[in-house]
Amino acid sequence: GVHWRNSFSYDYTNMDEMRWYNPEHGNGAAVDGRLSKYAISDITSTFTSTLNYAFSLFNDHHIGLLAGYEAYKNTYSMLHAHATGFSNSEMIELSMASTPYETKSKKDHERMQSFFGRINYDYLNKYFLSFSIRTDGSSRFAPGHRWGTFWSIGGNWRISEENFFKGIEWVDDLKLRASYGTSGNKQSDYLYGFQGLYDTGNNYNGQNGITHLQIPNDELSWEKSKNFNVGIDFGIFGCLNGSIEYYNKTSDALLLEKPLAPSTGFENAISNLGGMRNQGIEIDLHSTNINTKDFTWTTDFNIAFNNNKITSYPQKEEVVGTKIRTVGYSIYEFYMQEWAGVDPVNGDPLWYMDVTDDKGNPTGERTTTNTYSKATKYKLGSALPSATGGLTNTVSWKGVDFSFMFTYGFGGKIYDVYEENLLNDGNKTGYQLITEQADSWTPENTNASNPKFIPNNSNTSNGRSSRYLHNA
């Protein structure tokens, strides 16, 4: 029959936030206390309308049709006030500050419309086909590039329903499935990436001023992906269900920040550039360990392995912060100086540096330097874990549920920016220090883990390097 369904959702979030830095110690000491207050409002509404029609042909053929429309709207507003200089740490109000620093506000709007359709077909509840298509329009992109059309086709074969499989009693269900299609991505940190943006309230020489914040990109459009999946779903022994799936996703026109030449006056601009591939295997298992009238215990386990590589890029390589973008490597590849330890003679920090010939070409050998800016940057591994997953156990007794979840990830690198601040050898003032800083070089402790501690140090020993890069 025909079913027409309409739904509307409205989410409203209101948040007041205060950040207080005490004038007596820590980061607030240098400015006699710092107070920031935020008032944030986030409103999201979604309207969805779908029309379904299902029918059968000759009893064995089943067809389902769906057509739909969706409208999405989000409004985000924020008011921020910031001040320093508090003579009394007990009276934490902006009006008590001697130096009102800044007041800012903003309001962001995002809209999206979608039209979509799907056809499902099955024969004898054993052979299934599905085709879907959707067209999405997003306010994030420039006029003329706002709409993207994406589709997918998939099928599965329920092997356990075949006559030749009926005798295998320990297999409850076995299904082989595969799909291929395209998808789009609009997510980035830029709601208005195609527009030039300006910031008011920037005074210069006592006069009001406006700052040009963002260069426009009127060619900005959807990030597009091609997705292939193949997997097996199974149920065995009446108590264990699971799936094993291989996926391969290739993406083009990635939404990335493109660094710009300093002469432009901008650091970067959101652009469509390069290609990337993600492929891997995902395994999900669900077991019913105990199932009685009053007591049930189930376990869910999953693990995923993902390999990420940049497949194309308009430049040979591009450094973005502590990462590097280059073909053949992960987009999460760390690129920075490699820590070589401490000079036992004088306590200087050391980093590795390539030895070069008289033409400036690397010879393949390395030496060390105590000058951070002279040290060579190296590719030092990806932030992407080799595997991620989770384990959940759920126990139910007479209607009372108890569960605990454990998530994990191993492999990959993590950069500890907090350690950079708290193990700084005197390079940063106003920070507390961690206990590892006690093992600093002295004439009596020449095999120390950390360089000589010098208050108001300027040797950049805490510069971003593999000193703070750890295995996850």
Region locations from a protein language model:
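Generic secondary-structure boundary signal with a strong preference for alpha-helix termini
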Residues: 23, 80, 193, 358-360, ...
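Short, surface-exposed loop/turn motifs at beta-strand boundaries within globular domains
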Residues: 44, 384-386
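Surface-exposed, extracytoplasmic segments of Gram-negative outer-membrane nutrient-acquisition systems
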Residues: 29, 205-213, 250-273, 308-384, ...
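Extracellular/periplasmic, surface-exposed regions of secreted and cell-surface proteins
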Residues: 1-21, 30-334, 391, 395-398, ...
